[in-house]
Amino acid sequence: MKKIIHVDMDCFFAAVEMRDFPELRGKPIAVGGRSDRRGVISTCNYEARKFGVRSAMASAYALKLCPDLILVPGRMSVYKEVSAQIREVFARYTELIEPLSLDEAYLDVSDCTQHQGSATLIAEAIRREIFEVTGLTASAGIAPVKFLAKIASDLNKPNGQYVITPQMIPEFVKTLALIKIPGVGKVTAAKLETMGLITCADVQACSRQSLMERFGKFGGVLYDRAQGIDPRGISPHRERKSVGVETTLAKDIYTYEQCQAVMPQLIQELSGRISRSAKSRRIHKQVVKLKFDDFKQTTIEQRSDEVSVKLFYDLLKQALERRAGRGIRLLGVSVGLESEAVGAGLDEEVHGAQMDLGF
């Protein structure tokens, strides 16, 4: 039985700003780009969230919801330093750390003997140490599998934690909304709802085969998650699956020619990123992404063994066919990377009985 902890810092970027600039405390603040430059909110504090401000929201719209919102440009170098401090705390308890971003990570503490092996007590200790070292609060979810640990970390925010023991899983997943499962977005959830599938209990009444016929490989994953099954282990060295570049435009654009003028810089920057971070990796697809003035987006991709500038422009033309009169506010290009693993299989470790407190 694994013991997985998902640690998620509470409104991380905004919390760092409030820590370093106490005059911001108690006021609605957001870290993000300027509204006059079509910036986007990266994160915001809880005071701002009361007004409906959310991550990935246009700064201009956020200011309409909350006229007193204080926009902070952000200090990525500081956030990275604090993230490194947090990582050092994790490393005192386990080497099995899978960072998801600067402010969240999975930890496998199955073999940790501290605090009598209790995952609950270990999570409490980690959160306490993070606060002592950084002055910031963190929330945590504890469960035997990754996806439930991630869901649990959101159930007692901010500055809290939630435990899902093995015995709790059957009842917990029964009422769990499918949209809460990581990987199930709004579009997929809407498709599932048209089939009468809203909760995990609804999926449990289906066969794996019927779901796979409808959704392919994801159908099988969904079936497993609805039973509370997630065989994925912790990946301390997560393999990068793609490299991309995108830009939010100063003004909406509408034509292929206008997009054409933006593409060379994007492709050049993408080429540089591939050279720096994925030079030894083979690519397997190219992707063009457009976000429209209604904030809906579309992506077009095609298999490719090497980067082709012409293919990017061909994909751009296809993506523009979906514009339907809307303005384009964001344009992006990316490549998918082949896995570095060769002949990778499923390795299962069988652990002997441990005299510990479990969860």
UniProtKB/Swiss-Prot annotation:
Keyword Signal found: no
Site entry: Substrate discrimination: F13
Name of the top EC class for this enzyme: transferase
The keyword Magnesium belongs to this UniProt entry's keyword annotation: yes
Domain (UmuC): residue spans on this chain: 4-185
Stored PROSITE patterns: UMUC
Biological process terms in GO annotation: DNA-templated DNA replication; error-prone translesion synthesis; SOS response
Gene Ontology molecular function terms on file: damaged DNA binding; DNA-directed DNA polymerase activity; magnesium ion binding
Family in the record: Belongs to the DNA polymerase type-Y family.
Catalytic activity: DNA(n) + a 2'-deoxyribonucleoside 5'-triphosphate = DNA(n+1) + diphosphate
Gene name per UniProt: dinB
Matching InterPro entries: DNA/RNA_pol_sf, DNA_pol_Y-fam_lit_finger_sf, DNA_pol_Y-fam_little_finger, DNA_polymerase-Y, DNApol_IV, IMS_HHH_1, Rev_trsase/Diguanyl_cyclase, UmuC
Chief location: cytoplasm
Annotated NCBIfam families: PRK02406.1
Cellular compartments annotated: Cytoplasm
EC number of the protein: 2.7.7.7
Designated name of the protein: DNA polymerase IV
Stated role: Poorly processive, error-prone DNA polymerase involved in untargeted mutagenesis. Copies undamaged DNA at stalled replication forks, which arise in vivo from mismatched or misaligned primer ends. These misaligned primers can be extended by PolIV. Exhibits no 3'-5' exonuclease (proofreading) activity. May be involved in translesional synthesis, in conjunction with the beta clamp from PolIII.
Cofactor stoichiometry and binding remark: Binds 2 magnesium ions per subunit.
Organism taxonomic ancestry: Bacteria, Pseudomonadati, Pseudomonadota, Gammaproteobacteria, Alteromonadales
Cofactor(s) the protein needs: Mg(2+)
HAMAP family: DNApol_IV
Binding partners and assembly: Monomer.
Keywords from the UniProt entry: Cytoplasm, DNA damage, DNA repair, DNA replication, DNA-binding, DNA-directed DNA polymerase, Magnesium, Metal-binding, Mutator protein, Nucleotidyltransferase, Transferase
SUPFAM superfamilies documented for this protein: DNA/RNA polymerases (SSF56672), Lesion bypass DNA polymerase (Y-family), little finger domain (SSF100879)
Catalytic site positions: E104
Positions that bind Mg(2+): D8, D103
